[in-house]
């Protein structure tokens, strides 16, 4: 009795084919029990059969579509807000003036002087201009599902490729990626909807604080896990993605607490114009660019991920979706897993 199959110590690997078996149709064994079937199928790895797949749809396609829509709405919101933005003079700020927000109007006055070197704040623009606010809502609400899906995909990809190298800490951090991604995306959508002047300032403040904290933790966690295994990748694209993440996370984590502290204090007072001191406005610009760059780098990470619908042999039955794959002489002429595996091992 000579062992032709796998030499693993696994229980099902101890099943052997007799070397005296002739390599013809009569040497194929038909299982008589579930245990026998498992033994005969031992070592069978299901091929993805991308060459004869019924469907091969890259995940990056819907991701790009949602990215273009989101970025387009965000940039469009900025331009429309700048176009309709009104800059009051000092007398109007003190005496008060009427601000139009869509069909509603409210009177605003403040004793805080207009910043001499001020620049428009993007968040304040969305706060005071209704079209910009609506486009901002589209930009952050539409891609929530695809963002969480991509985070789950990256988590599963990392755990699949580096499963044996994953420590308990790595597993916890990887599993937290989609959770923090959902929290930050959900909080961003909430503070885009709940405005300061029309709704609840304290709720807006809370949503922004939770967003800031969850986004920082999410970016640090994701970067740490992916950087831990980046040395195993030989692709230049993966290196580019890692560099984008590292630069973005350094900028974001350093600037976000400083900016958020000032922004939270400014919510306490009426927002009568979109301008803020130049330093904090520039901080906001860099934070937004870093945040966008970090999440755009995920498009590189998922570039090879696809939805594939393919013929299976593990089920024990042919899938008659495309009969050409199972005709005589085709790849799956013998599509039953136990038979396919024996023919592979015995080179029939």
From Swiss-Prot:
Pfam families: Frag1. One of its GO terms (biological process) is GPI anchor biosynthetic process. It comes from the Eukaryota. InterPro entries: Frag1/DRAM/Sfk1, PGAP2. GO terms for cellular component: endoplasmic reticulum membrane; Golgi membrane. PANTHER family: FGF RECEPTOR ACTIVATING PROTEIN 1 (PTHR12892), PROTEIN CBG16685 (PTHR12892:SF8). This is Uncharacterized protein C14B9.3. It comes from Caenorhabditis elegans.
């Amino acid at each position: 009795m000579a062992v032709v199959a796998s030499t693993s110590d696994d229980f099902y690997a101890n099943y052997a084919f007799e070397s005296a078996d002739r390599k013809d149709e009569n040497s194929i064994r038909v299982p008589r029990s579930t245990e026998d079937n498992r033994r005969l199928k031992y070592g069978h790895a299901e091929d993805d059969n991308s060459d004869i797949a019924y469907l091969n749809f890259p995940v990056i396609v819907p991701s790009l579509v949602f990215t273009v829509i989101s970025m387009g709405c965000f940039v469009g919101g900025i331009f429309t807000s700048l176009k309709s933005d009104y800059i009051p003079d000092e007398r109007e700020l003190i005496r008060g003036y009427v601000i139009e927000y869509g069909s509603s109007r409210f009177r605003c006055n403040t004793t805080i002087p207009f910043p001499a070197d001020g620049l428009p704040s993007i968040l304040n623009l969305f706060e005071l201009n209704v079209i910009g606010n609506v486009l901002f809502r589209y930009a952050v609400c539409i891609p929530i599902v695809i963002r969480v899906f991509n985070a789950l995909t990256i988590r599963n990809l990392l755990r699949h490729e580096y499963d044996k190298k994953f420590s308990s800490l790595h597993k916890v951090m990887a599993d937290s990626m989609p959770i923090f991604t959902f929290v930050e995306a959900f909080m961003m959508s909430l503070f885009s909807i709940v405005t300061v002047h029309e709704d609840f300032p304290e709720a807006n403040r809370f949503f922004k604080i939770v967003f800031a904290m969850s986004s920082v933790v999410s970016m640090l966690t994701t970067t740490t896990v992916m950087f831990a295994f980046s040395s195993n990748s030989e692709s230049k694209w993966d290196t580019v993605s890692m560099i984008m993440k590292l630069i973005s996370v350094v900028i974001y984590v350093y600037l976000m607490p400083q900016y958020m502290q000032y922004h939270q204090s400014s919510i306490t007072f009426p927002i009568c114009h979109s301008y803020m001191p130049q330093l904090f406005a520039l901080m906001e610009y860099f934070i937004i660019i870093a945040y966008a760059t970090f999440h755009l780098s995920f498009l590189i990470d998922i570039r090879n991920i696809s939805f594939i619908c393919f013929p299976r042999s593990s089920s024990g039955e042919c899938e008659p979706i495309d009969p050409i794959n199972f005709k005589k002489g085709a790849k799956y002429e013998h599509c039953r897993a136990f038979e396919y595996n024996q023919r592979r091992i015995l080179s029939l």
